[in-house]
Amino acid sequence: MAELACFCYPHLENDSYRFIPFNSLAIKCMLTAKVDKKDQDKFYNSIIYGIAPPPQFKKRYNTNDNSRGMNYETPMFNKVAVLICEALNSIKVTQSDVANVLSKVVSVRHLENLVLRRENHQDVLFHSKELLLKSVLIAIGHSKEIETTATAEGGEIVFQNAAFTMWKLTYLEHRLMPILDQNFIEYKITVNEDKPISESHVKELIAELRWQYNKFAVITHGKGHYRVVKYSSVANHADRVYATFKSNNKNGNVLEFNLLDQRVIWQNWYAFTSSMKQGNTLEICKKLLFQKMKRESNPFKGLSTDRKMDEVSQIGI
């Protein structure tokens, strides 16, 4: 995760702003600079290489002292920064909006995936600039539309029906902020269209999840799509979701946290996110992840007979 101010800076032209991507040498200069505390939140002028991000975001970049940040010296950083600028420059951002826009925390890996989709000649985003920019504006939280299958970050499709598409995420192969744990495996489910979904299509999805992905929890980050994650990583997701939710509220980026279909979501996660929305502390919310929940009656009678027991998946073992 990183703020948009880590990728670009605003340049005032007439009554609105044009956004310009940072170059890696300017960032490198900022990372070595001694800056007064009062100037930590201001864009840094490297003198030689142009404007750099505010020093308060130093931890967002990979350095000798911090291996968890972005690999900003890779070509992928520039591609992501350029893509963000293209999207922001396609809309009008005024002086009253600019601070709010740049403070938004975005998924670095999501944006890298959109770059990969853009470069894939077989992908619809390669052929449609309008759909590409729409996908980016959704990814950076500027659009109120949810991420659907056409505007999704992408990955490898492992399941699809008339209503849903399930993607295996490819973060292990990333350049900008790769997942280093070689045991990482995670999926994302997007709706094909943002409209009411028939019970039969929900039932098909639940059957697929129950039998092929029974070692995983189905959760949501509140953005209109599902994530299918290992139970061992749920607490980590909870920390990130809670931190982003609080940060957005603090900065005035109040977005509706979409709890999605309770029949699909893991019971404990639904309880966690509901508690978070009520304003409870992280400690109180996380207790619900490890609490034994009363099993609800099956909303789809006969679902367990849809597949034979010898078809139960070994994925995740």
Curated annotation (Swiss-Prot):
It is found in: Host cytoplasm. One of its GO terms (cellular component) is host cell cytoplasm. It holds the Pfam family Rota_NS35_N. Its cofactor is Mg(2+). Keywords: ATP-binding, Host cytoplasm, Host-virus interaction, Hydrolase, Magnesium, Metal-binding, Nucleotide-binding, RNA-binding. It comes from the Viruses. Belongs to the rotavirus NSP2 family. This is Non-structural protein 2. It comes from Rotavirus A (strain RVA/Monkey/United States/RRV/1975/G3P5B[3]) (RV-A).
